[in-house]
Design a protein with these regions (language model features):
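Short glycine/proline- and acidic residue-enriched helix-loop micro-motifs
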Residues: 38-41, 101-110, 161-169
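Beta-hairpin (beta-strand-turn-beta-strand) motif
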Residues: 73-75, 90, 136-138
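A gly/proline- and charged-residue-enriched helix-loop-helix capping module
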Residues: 90-127
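Short low-complexity stretches enriched in small and charged residues
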Residues: 19-28, 91-94, 210, 231-234
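A charged helix-plus-loop insertion that forms the helical arch/lid used to bind
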Residues: 86-99, 153-159
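N-terminal basic, low-complexity leaders that serve as flexible interaction/assembly modules and, when applicable
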Residues: 1-85, 220, 251
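Active-site loop segments of alpha/beta catalytic cores
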Residues: 114-261
C-alpha cells in the first residue's frame, strides 16, 4: 500500500507529516518481550515468518504509525553467507571466525534460500496492513565491519587493521554489494513499498575513505535496484558534515540523519 509515507518520499503532496520509528518493533513493547522469552535464539526468531509478521505489526496495534518496518536484523546477510552469529548480553553480536574466501564463493541462490522466511514474512505483513511496508538491509561497509571485526566495533575498532588486505576487502565489498542487491530485490518482489539501507558504522570511516567504502558501494546498489521504482532511505550514521556529500553523490530517495548533524 503506497500511503502517506511513500507519497512523502516520492515528493507528492501530503496532508500531514508521516511518522515511523527505526526500532518501532522491539524490546520496549511487553508483548515483544514475551515472544522473546519463548524464543531465545534471535536468528531463529528472525527466520520465523509467523512471529516476524506478528512482531512487525505489534506497534501498529498501539500507535497510528504510517509504516510497518519488517522485524529483522542487518546481520542476516552475514548469516546467509555462512557466518554463525551469537547475541551475547552486554556485548551484542559475536560472529564466528570464518574463511573470507569461502564467503566470496557463496552463490546467490544459497543466500536467497536461507533468507526466504524474511520474504514470506513480508508477504504476510502486506496481507494484514494497509500501511507502507519497509524492508531493510545493512550497507556493505557496516556488514564488512561485522564480518572482519567479528563483533560490534563500538569499543574496539582499528580501520587500518580491518582494511590491511585491500584486495580482499575490495572483493568482499563487491560480494556484499551483490548479495545486498539480491536481498533488496527479493524484499521488493515480496511486497516491500520502501527499502531502508542502514550504514550503522559509516561514522568509523576516515573522511577521505567515505567515497570508497560508503558512498560508492551504496550508489552501486541504488543504481541496480532503481528500475523497480521503490524508494530507498539511506542512513549513513555518524558521518556528520559529510551528509551533504553523501546526498549529492548517492541521491537516495530519502535520508535518515542522526544526533551528530
Amino acid at each position: 500500500m503506497k500511503n502517506t509515507l511513500w507519497e512523502c518520499i516520492m515528493e507528492k503532496k501530503t496532508f500531514y507529516t508521516p511518522i515511523w520509528f527505526m526500532r518501532q518493533a522491539g524490546r520496549y513493547l511487553p508483548e515483544f518481550r514475551e515472544i522473546r522469552k519463548r524464543n531465545p535464539n534471535f536468528i531463529k526468531l528472525c527466520l520465523n515468518p509467523n512471529l516476524v509478521s506478528e512482531i512487525t505489526l505489534q506497534p501498529l496495534k498501539r500507535f497510528d504509525l504510517d509504516a510497518a518496518i519488517i522485524f529483522s536484523d542487518i546481520l542476516m546477510i552475514p548469516y546467509a553467507l555462512g557466518q554463525k552469529i551469537e547475541l551475547k548480553k552486554g556485548e551484542g553480536p559475536i560472529l564466528e571466525e570464518h574463511d573470507i574466501k569461502e564467503i566470496l564463493i557463496v552463490e546467490e541462490a544459497d543466500v536467497i534460500e536461507k533468507l526466504k522466511p524474511i520474504y514470506q514474512a513480508i508477504k504476510q505483513v502486506k496481507n494484514k496492513t494497509k500501511k507502507s511496508v519497509i524492508g531493510f538491509t545493512g550497507a556493505p561497509w557496516t556488514l564488512l565491519v561485522y564480518i572482519l571485526n567479528k563483533k560490534s566495533p563500538k569499543k574496539n575498532f582499528d580501520f587500518n587493521f580491518i582494511t590491511q588486505d585491500k584486495l580482499l576487502v575490495n572483493k568482499l565489498i563487491e560480494k556484499l554489494v551483490e548479495m545486498i542487491t539480491f536481498h533488496i530485490i527479493k524484499q521488493i518482489e515480496a511486497g516491500a513499498d520502501i527499502i531502508q539501507v542502514f550504514d550503522s558504522w559509516a561514522g568509523l570511516l576516515p573522511k577521505k575513505e567515505l567515497p570508497n567504502y560508503c558512498f560508492d558501494p551504496t550508489l552501486e546498489i541504488l543504481q541496480r535496484v532503481k528500475k523497480f521504482g521503490v524508494p530507498v532511505i539511506c542512513f549513513p550514521r555518524g558521518i556528520k558534515e559529510s551528509y551533504s556529500d553523501f546526498c549529492s553523490t548517492v541521491k537516495p530517495g530519502c535520508i535518515s540523519i542522526d544526533y551528530n548533524v
